[in-house]
Regions:
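A short C-terminal boundary segment appended to hydrolase-like catalytic domains
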Residues: 279-332
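Active-site neighborhood of phospho(di)ester-bond hydrolases with catalytic His/Asp-centered motifs
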Residues: 28-30, 58-65, 91-98, 160, ...
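Loop/turn elements at helix/coil->beta-strand transitions in domains of secreted/extracellular proteins
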Residues: 21-25, 55-60, 86-93, 150-157, ...
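Extended active-site neighborhood of metal-dependent phosphoesterases/phosphodiesterases
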Residues: 72-170, 177-179, 251-269, 285-288, ...
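Conserved beta-sheet core of the metallophosphoesterase superfamily
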Residues: 211, 217-293
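N-terminal active-site segment of His-dependent metallophosphoesterases
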Residues: 17-74, 204-206
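Active-site environment of divalent metal-dependent phosphoester hydrolases
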Residues: 35-37, 68-71, 96-105, 141-142, ...
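Active-site-proximal segments of metal-dependent phosphoesterases and phosphodiesterases across multiple
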Residues: 179-238
Protein backbone atom coordinates (compact mmCIF):
# COMPACT_ATOMS: atom_id res chain seq x y z
CA UNK A 1 0.00 0.00 0.00
CA UNK A 2 2.88 2.35 0.83
CA UNK A 3 4.47 1.57 -2.54
CA UNK A 4 1.26 2.46 -4.37
CA UNK A 5 0.96 5.73 -2.45
CA UNK A 6 4.56 6.60 -3.30
CA UNK A 7 4.06 5.94 -6.99
CA UNK A 8 0.87 8.00 -7.11
CA UNK A 9 2.65 10.88 -5.39
CA UNK A 10 5.57 10.54 -7.81
CA UNK A 11 3.18 10.75 -10.74
CA UNK A 12 1.64 13.98 -9.45
CA UNK A 13 5.06 15.50 -8.76
CA UNK A 14 6.42 14.56 -12.19
CA UNK A 15 3.46 15.95 -14.11
CA UNK A 16 3.37 19.20 -12.15
CA UNK A 17 7.10 19.96 -12.06
CA UNK A 18 9.26 21.56 -14.69
CA UNK A 19 12.74 20.21 -15.42
CA UNK A 20 14.77 21.05 -12.31
CA UNK A 21 18.19 22.68 -12.37
CA UNK A 22 19.71 19.98 -10.16
CA UNK A 23 18.47 16.95 -12.05
CA UNK A 24 18.31 15.45 -15.53
CA UNK A 25 15.29 13.44 -16.67
CA UNK A 26 15.29 11.16 -19.70
CA UNK A 27 12.30 9.22 -21.00
CA UNK A 28 13.23 5.87 -22.53
CA UNK A 29 10.90 4.41 -25.17
CA UNK A 30 11.43 0.63 -25.30
CA UNK A 31 10.81 -1.40 -28.47
CA UNK A 32 7.69 0.11 -30.03
CA UNK A 33 7.44 -2.38 -32.90
CA UNK A 34 4.30 -4.33 -32.03
CA UNK A 35 2.26 -1.19 -31.45
CA UNK A 36 2.38 -0.66 -35.21
CA UNK A 37 1.40 -4.28 -35.74
CA UNK A 38 -1.52 -4.31 -33.29
CA UNK A 39 -2.49 -1.04 -31.65
CA UNK A 40 -0.85 2.24 -32.74
CA UNK A 41 -3.21 4.09 -30.43
CA UNK A 42 -1.17 2.81 -27.47
CA UNK A 43 2.02 4.28 -28.92
CA UNK A 44 0.14 7.48 -29.61
CA UNK A 45 -0.76 7.68 -25.91
CA UNK A 46 2.96 7.59 -25.09
CA UNK A 47 3.63 10.46 -27.48
CA UNK A 48 0.64 12.41 -26.12
CA UNK A 49 2.04 12.05 -22.60
CA UNK A 50 5.55 13.09 -23.62
CA UNK A 51 4.26 16.16 -25.43
CA UNK A 52 2.04 17.11 -22.49
CA UNK A 53 4.90 16.77 -20.01
CA UNK A 54 7.75 18.03 -22.18
CA UNK A 55 8.68 20.76 -19.68
CA UNK A 56 9.59 18.01 -17.19
CA UNK A 57 11.71 16.02 -19.66
CA UNK A 58 15.22 16.75 -20.90
CA UNK A 59 15.42 14.18 -23.73
CA UNK A 60 13.67 11.15 -25.20
CA UNK A 61 15.66 7.99 -25.95
CA UNK A 62 14.11 5.41 -28.29
CA UNK A 63 16.12 2.18 -28.03
CA UNK A 64 15.45 0.62 -31.44
CA UNK A 65 12.92 -1.63 -33.18
CA UNK A 66 10.79 1.37 -33.89
CA UNK A 67 9.07 -0.79 -36.55
CA UNK A 68 8.04 -4.44 -36.63
CA UNK A 69 8.42 -5.34 -40.30
CA UNK A 70 10.60 -2.49 -41.62
CA UNK A 71 7.69 -1.62 -43.90
CA UNK A 72 7.17 1.83 -45.47
CA UNK A 73 3.71 2.26 -43.91
CA UNK A 74 5.18 1.63 -40.46
CA UNK A 75 7.98 4.12 -41.04
CA UNK A 76 5.49 6.70 -42.29
CA UNK A 77 3.36 6.33 -39.16
CA UNK A 78 6.42 6.28 -36.88
CA UNK A 79 7.72 9.51 -38.38
CA UNK A 80 4.32 11.18 -38.15
CA UNK A 81 4.18 10.40 -34.43
CA UNK A 82 7.80 11.07 -33.53
CA UNK A 83 7.92 14.50 -35.12
CA UNK A 84 5.45 15.57 -32.45
CA UNK A 85 8.37 15.25 -30.04
CA UNK A 86 10.32 17.55 -32.34
CA UNK A 87 7.41 20.00 -32.36
CA UNK A 88 7.82 20.77 -28.65
CA UNK A 89 11.60 21.11 -28.92
CA UNK A 90 12.57 17.95 -27.04
CA UNK A 91 15.90 16.34 -27.95
CA UNK A 92 15.33 12.89 -29.46
CA UNK A 93 17.80 10.01 -29.70
CA UNK A 94 16.68 7.43 -32.27
CA UNK A 95 18.13 3.94 -32.56
CA UNK A 96 18.00 1.27 -35.25
CA UNK A 97 17.18 -2.24 -34.02
CA UNK A 98 17.24 -5.55 -35.86
CA UNK A 99 13.65 -5.07 -37.08
CA UNK A 100 14.60 -1.69 -38.56
CA UNK A 101 17.38 -3.21 -40.68
CA UNK A 102 17.22 -5.56 -43.67
CA UNK A 103 17.26 -6.02 -47.43
CA UNK A 104 13.49 -5.49 -47.64
CA UNK A 105 10.39 -5.59 -45.41
CA UNK A 106 9.91 -8.77 -43.35
CA UNK A 107 13.65 -9.50 -43.42
CA UNK A 108 15.23 -8.95 -40.02
CA UNK A 109 18.86 -7.89 -40.37
CA UNK A 110 19.53 -10.42 -43.15
CA UNK A 111 21.84 -7.76 -44.57
CA UNK A 112 22.82 -4.37 -43.22
CA UNK A 113 20.43 -2.06 -45.04
CA UNK A 114 18.90 0.99 -43.35
CA UNK A 115 17.60 2.78 -46.42
CA UNK A 116 14.00 2.96 -45.19
CA UNK A 117 15.00 4.34 -41.80
CA UNK A 118 17.10 7.00 -43.48
CA UNK A 119 14.36 7.80 -45.99
CA UNK A 120 11.77 8.55 -43.32
CA UNK A 121 14.18 10.04 -40.76
CA UNK A 122 16.67 11.72 -43.12
CA UNK A 123 19.90 13.19 -41.86
CA UNK A 124 18.91 16.51 -43.42
CA UNK A 125 16.00 16.65 -40.97
CA UNK A 126 17.77 15.32 -37.86
CA UNK A 127 20.99 17.30 -38.27
CA UNK A 128 19.03 20.54 -38.37
CA UNK A 129 18.07 20.18 -34.72
CA UNK A 130 19.91 22.47 -32.28
CA UNK A 131 20.88 19.49 -30.13
CA UNK A 132 22.41 17.46 -32.98
CA UNK A 133 26.01 16.52 -32.24
CA UNK A 134 27.20 14.58 -35.27
CA UNK A 135 27.12 11.29 -37.15
CA UNK A 136 29.65 8.73 -38.33
CA UNK A 137 28.32 7.50 -41.67
CA UNK A 138 28.03 10.08 -44.42
CA UNK A 139 24.42 11.05 -45.06
CA UNK A 140 23.00 8.57 -42.54
CA UNK A 141 21.70 8.60 -38.96
CA UNK A 142 22.75 5.00 -38.14
CA UNK A 143 25.45 6.05 -35.64
CA UNK A 144 25.02 9.53 -34.20
CA UNK A 145 25.01 11.53 -30.99
CA UNK A 146 23.03 14.38 -29.54
CA UNK A 147 24.07 17.00 -27.00
CA UNK A 148 21.77 17.88 -24.10
CA UNK A 149 22.19 20.41 -21.29
CA UNK A 150 20.39 19.20 -18.18
CA UNK A 151 20.89 19.42 -14.43
CA UNK A 152 23.61 22.01 -14.83
CA UNK A 153 25.73 19.60 -16.89
CA UNK A 154 26.19 18.53 -20.49
CA UNK A 155 25.23 15.07 -21.73
CA UNK A 156 26.22 13.34 -24.94
CA UNK A 157 23.73 10.59 -25.83
CA UNK A 158 25.41 8.29 -28.34
CA UNK A 159 23.19 6.06 -30.48
CA UNK A 160 24.81 2.96 -31.99
CA UNK A 161 22.75 0.56 -34.14
CA UNK A 162 22.01 -3.11 -33.48
CA UNK A 163 25.34 -4.93 -33.13
CA UNK A 164 27.70 -1.99 -33.63
CA UNK A 165 30.94 -2.65 -35.45
CA UNK A 166 34.44 -2.01 -34.13
CA UNK A 167 34.57 1.14 -36.22
CA UNK A 168 31.38 2.45 -34.62
CA UNK A 169 32.64 1.64 -31.13
CA UNK A 170 35.94 3.38 -31.88
CA UNK A 171 34.01 6.45 -33.09
CA UNK A 172 31.92 6.45 -29.91
CA UNK A 173 35.14 6.35 -27.91
CA UNK A 174 36.43 9.36 -29.80
CA UNK A 175 33.25 11.27 -28.91
CA UNK A 176 33.67 10.36 -25.24
CA UNK A 177 37.36 11.30 -25.19
CA UNK A 178 36.82 14.62 -26.96
CA UNK A 179 34.15 15.69 -24.45
CA UNK A 180 35.69 14.94 -21.03
CA UNK A 181 33.38 17.46 -19.36
CA UNK A 182 30.22 15.68 -20.59
CA UNK A 183 28.36 12.72 -19.17
CA UNK A 184 28.08 9.95 -21.78
CA UNK A 185 24.93 7.85 -22.18
CA UNK A 186 24.90 4.96 -24.66
CA UNK A 187 21.68 4.17 -26.51
CA UNK A 188 21.94 0.81 -28.28
CA UNK A 189 19.46 -1.91 -29.09
CA UNK A 190 21.10 -5.14 -27.85
CA UNK A 191 23.37 -5.02 -24.81
CA UNK A 192 21.95 -6.68 -21.68
CA UNK A 193 20.28 -10.07 -21.46
CA UNK A 194 17.25 -10.80 -19.27
CA UNK A 195 19.47 -12.39 -16.59
CA UNK A 196 21.17 -8.99 -16.17
CA UNK A 197 24.39 -10.14 -17.81
CA UNK A 198 25.94 -8.80 -20.99
CA UNK A 199 24.70 -10.46 -24.17
CA UNK A 200 27.40 -12.88 -25.29
CA UNK A 201 27.90 -15.89 -27.54
CA UNK A 202 25.75 -18.16 -25.34
CA UNK A 203 22.57 -16.05 -25.45
CA UNK A 204 19.50 -16.02 -27.68
CA UNK A 205 18.96 -13.04 -29.98
CA UNK A 206 22.63 -12.07 -30.06
CA UNK A 207 23.61 -9.82 -33.00
CA UNK A 208 26.25 -12.25 -34.25
CA UNK A 209 23.49 -14.79 -35.04
CA UNK A 210 21.82 -12.57 -37.64
CA UNK A 211 22.52 -12.74 -41.38
CA UNK A 212 24.04 -9.29 -41.50
CA UNK A 213 26.95 -10.60 -39.44
CA UNK A 214 28.23 -12.04 -42.73
CA UNK A 215 28.05 -8.70 -44.55
CA UNK A 216 31.71 -8.12 -45.44
CA UNK A 217 31.07 -4.48 -46.36
CA UNK A 218 29.56 -3.79 -42.95
CA UNK A 219 32.01 -5.58 -40.68
CA UNK A 220 31.35 -7.98 -37.82
CA UNK A 221 28.79 -6.85 -35.24
CA UNK A 222 29.50 -6.82 -31.52
CA UNK A 223 27.37 -8.44 -28.85
CA UNK A 224 26.95 -6.79 -25.46
CA UNK A 225 30.22 -8.12 -24.10
CA UNK A 226 32.10 -6.61 -27.03
CA UNK A 227 30.38 -3.25 -26.57
CA UNK A 228 31.40 -3.25 -22.91
CA UNK A 229 34.98 -4.32 -23.53
CA UNK A 230 35.69 -2.06 -26.51
CA UNK A 231 33.81 1.09 -25.51
CA UNK A 232 31.73 1.33 -22.36
CA UNK A 233 34.33 0.09 -19.86
CA UNK A 234 37.16 2.24 -21.22
CA UNK A 235 35.86 5.76 -20.74
CA UNK A 236 35.55 7.53 -17.42
CA UNK A 237 32.59 9.68 -18.44
CA UNK A 238 30.24 6.84 -19.47
CA UNK A 239 27.49 6.78 -16.84
CA UNK A 240 24.59 4.77 -18.32
CA UNK A 241 23.50 2.36 -21.04
CA UNK A 242 19.88 1.91 -22.15
CA UNK A 243 18.81 -1.02 -24.35
CA UNK A 244 15.89 -3.26 -25.37
CA UNK A 245 15.58 -6.19 -27.82
CA UNK A 246 15.49 -9.20 -25.46
CA UNK A 247 12.28 -11.13 -24.76
CA UNK A 248 11.49 -13.55 -21.87
CA UNK A 249 11.04 -11.19 -18.88
CA UNK A 250 12.23 -8.24 -20.98
CA UNK A 251 14.00 -6.66 -18.02
CA UNK A 252 17.57 -6.56 -16.78
CA UNK A 253 19.60 -4.28 -14.53
CA UNK A 254 23.34 -4.22 -13.96
CA UNK A 255 25.90 -1.90 -12.39
CA UNK A 256 29.47 -2.34 -13.61
CA UNK A 257 32.76 -0.63 -12.77
CA UNK A 258 34.78 0.74 -15.68
CA UNK A 259 38.56 0.59 -15.81
CA UNK A 260 38.73 4.18 -14.55
CA UNK A 261 36.61 3.43 -11.47
CA UNK A 262 33.35 4.91 -12.76
CA UNK A 263 30.15 2.97 -12.11
CA UNK A 264 28.02 2.36 -15.21
CA UNK A 265 24.26 1.93 -14.75
CA UNK A 266 22.96 -0.46 -17.42
CA UNK A 267 19.27 -1.14 -18.04
CA UNK A 268 17.24 -3.39 -20.33
CA UNK A 269 13.51 -2.71 -20.70
CA UNK A 270 11.22 -4.33 -23.28
CA UNK A 271 7.45 -4.82 -23.23
CA UNK A 272 6.63 -5.86 -26.81
CA UNK A 273 4.51 -8.84 -27.86
CA UNK A 274 6.51 -11.95 -26.99
CA UNK A 275 7.67 -10.66 -23.62
CA UNK A 276 6.15 -12.57 -20.70
CA UNK A 277 2.74 -11.11 -19.80
CA UNK A 278 2.73 -8.59 -22.63
CA UNK A 279 -0.64 -7.26 -23.81
CA UNK A 280 -1.56 -4.73 -26.47
CA UNK A 281 1.96 -4.53 -27.83
CA UNK A 282 3.39 -3.57 -24.44
CA UNK A 283 0.55 -1.64 -22.75
CA UNK A 284 2.34 1.65 -23.24
CA UNK A 285 5.02 1.28 -20.58
CA UNK A 286 7.99 3.64 -20.81
CA UNK A 287 10.91 4.35 -18.52
CA UNK A 288 11.60 7.62 -16.70
CA UNK A 289 15.23 7.89 -15.56
CA UNK A 290 16.09 10.87 -13.36
CA UNK A 291 19.63 11.70 -12.28
CA UNK A 292 19.38 13.62 -8.98
CA UNK A 293 22.59 15.55 -8.39
CA UNK A 294 21.61 16.86 -4.94
CA UNK A 295 20.72 13.47 -3.45
CA UNK A 296 23.27 11.48 -5.49
CA UNK A 297 20.62 9.15 -6.85
CA UNK A 298 19.48 7.69 -10.15
CA UNK A 299 15.74 7.10 -9.90
CA UNK A 300 14.00 4.83 -12.41
CA UNK A 301 10.23 4.61 -12.78
CA UNK A 302 8.16 2.72 -15.34
CA UNK A 303 4.87 4.30 -16.32
CA UNK A 304 2.10 3.59 -18.82
CA UNK A 305 0.25 6.62 -20.20
CA UNK A 306 -2.21 4.16 -21.76
CA UNK A 307 -3.09 2.50 -18.44
CA UNK A 308 -2.37 5.67 -16.45
CA UNK A 309 -0.42 3.77 -13.83
CA UNK A 310 3.08 2.74 -12.83
CA UNK A 311 4.32 -0.80 -13.30
CA UNK A 312 3.68 -2.92 -10.21
CA UNK A 313 7.01 -4.77 -10.23
CA UNK A 314 9.97 -3.54 -8.15
CA UNK A 315 12.13 -4.65 -11.11
CA UNK A 316 10.72 -1.66 -12.99
CA UNK A 317 10.75 0.98 -10.21
CA UNK A 318 13.95 1.41 -8.23
CA UNK A 319 16.63 3.86 -7.08
CA UNK A 320 20.40 3.62 -7.40
CA UNK A 321 21.84 5.40 -4.37
CA UNK A 322 25.25 6.96 -3.71
CA UNK A 323 25.90 7.89 -7.33
CA UNK A 324 29.21 9.76 -7.30
CA UNK A 325 28.55 12.27 -10.06
CA UNK A 326 31.98 13.85 -9.47
CA UNK A 327 33.76 10.68 -10.62
CA UNK A 328 32.78 10.91 -14.29
CA UNK A 329 33.80 14.23 -15.78
CA UNK A 330 35.99 17.28 -15.41
CA UNK A 331 32.76 19.25 -14.92
CA UNK A 332 32.32 20.73 -11.43
Amino acid sequence: MKTLAYLLLAAVCFISASAAENEATFVILPDTQTYFEQCPEVFESQIDWIVKNHDSIDAVIQVGDLTQENYPAEWYLAHRMMVRIDSVGLPLSLNLGNHDIGSRPFKYSDTYNTDLANRYFPLSERSGKPYWGGNLHEGRIDAHYISVDAGGANWKIISLPFGPTDRELEWAGQIADSHPDSYIVLNTHAYLYCDSTLIDGKDYWKPTDYGYANDSLRGCPNNGDGIWEKFVSRHRNVIAVFCGHVLKSGVGTRVSKGVNGNMVYEMLANFQRGVEGSKMGGEGYLRIATFHFDTKELEVKTYSPWLKRYHASPAHNFIFKNVDFTNYTTHE
